């Protein structure tokens, strides 16, 4: 992790030092840093709207965009998505320099304006920069592995909900103890999905207490290629044999991905 990023994290922890304002969720040399900032901003009628801003600073940050998630019990999902899109637009203007504090200040000062816009504004209507300028043009695909899923019914419902809200397609795949999630869609939405999965209490620990997902691995992340099948929906599927799972990947033009990332997990 770059020294300037370490300094930024230290500064953020000092700035947001009030009760429950700052929460570091994970930090590593390989996956970057994931943290939450709890703050407030002025709403449509001057009321204080509590905001939960989750950020993922990947290893390449600040030369690449951070992952951003906006949640609030006082806002609709569409309003949260619009706020996230606006923040990503501001982030594109600040690439190559530490930006998190600037982004928090921006949403604090501009939430009222964001909320005054129609809720129909969403991630398929981005206009801040041409897509080709972001380097993320076209759909992306990410393959994830979960170590376990104790509260399976609740967990599956959460995954389906996030995929639907973020317009992601793909598969949640079970084969014995192997659990894989294959996602296709807008890269910023996949990043937000990862933040939600890492910061939400979707499972339970061995004592039955609600807990966050700490054992998720990103096996692959790449642009969807012409030979790859585009999934039309997000589905939950179970496979009784390795051959069935391999056929699923092969039918989607992902035989190489299966050989490189999945086969070794079950041998």
From Swiss-Prot:
Localisation:
Nucleus; Cytoplasm
Q: Which residues form the RWD domain?
A: 7-114
Q: Read off the InterPro entries from this record.
A: RWD_dom, RWDD3, UBQ-conjugating_enzyme/RWD
The gene name on file is Rwdd3
- Supply the source organism for this entry: Mus musculus
What is the protein named?
RWD domain-containing protein 3
Instruction: Give a Gene Ontology cellular component term annotated to this protein.
Output: nucleus
Q: Does the keyword RNA-binding apply?
A: no
Q: Which PROSITE patterns match?
A: RWD
Purpose of the protein = Enhancer of SUMO conjugation. Via its interaction with UBE2I/UBC9, increases SUMO conjugation to proteins by promoting the binding of E1 and E2 enzymes, thioester linkage between SUMO and UBE2I/UBC9 and transfer of SUMO to specific target proteins which include HIF1A, PIAS, NFKBIA, NR3C1 and TOP1. Positively regulates the NF-kappa-B signaling pathway by enhancing the sumoylation of NF-kappa-B inhibitor alpha (NFKBIA), promoting its stabilization which consequently leads to an increased inhibition of NF-kappa-B transcriptional activity.
């Amino acid at each position: 992790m770059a020294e300037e990023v370490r300094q930024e994290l230290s500064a953020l922890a000092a700035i947001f030092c009030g009760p429950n304002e700052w929460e570091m969720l994970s930090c590593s040399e390989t996956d970057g840093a994931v943290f939450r900032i709890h703050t407030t901003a002025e709403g449509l009628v001057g009321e204080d709207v509590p905001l939960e801003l989750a950020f993922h600073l990947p290893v390449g940050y600040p030369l690449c965009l951070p992952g951003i998630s906006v949640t609030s019990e006082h806002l609709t999902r569409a309003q949260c998505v619009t706020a996230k899109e606006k923040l990503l637009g501001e982030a594109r203007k600040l690439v190559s320099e530490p930006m998190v504090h600037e982004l928090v200040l921006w949403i604090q000062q501009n939430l009222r304006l964001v909320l005054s816009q129609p809720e129909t504004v969403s991630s398929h209507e981005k206009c801040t920069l041409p897509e080709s300028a972001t380097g993320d043009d076209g759909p992306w695909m990410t393959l994830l592995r979960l170590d376990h899923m104790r509260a399976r019914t609740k967990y599956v419902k959460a995954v389906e909900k996030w995929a639907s809200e973020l317009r992601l397609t793909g598969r949640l795949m079970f084969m014995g103890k192997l659990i894989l999630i294959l996602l296709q869609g807008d890269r910023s939405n996949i990043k937000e999905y990862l933040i939600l999965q890492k910061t939400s209490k979707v499972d339970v620990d061995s004592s039955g207490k609600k807990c966050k997902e700490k054992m998720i691995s990103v096996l692959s992340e790449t642009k969807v290629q012409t030979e790859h099948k585009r999934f039309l929906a997000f589905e939950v599927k179970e496979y009784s044999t390795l051959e069935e799972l391999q056929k699923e990947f092969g039918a989607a033009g992902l035989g190489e991905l299966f050989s490189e990332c999945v086969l070794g997990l079950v041998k």
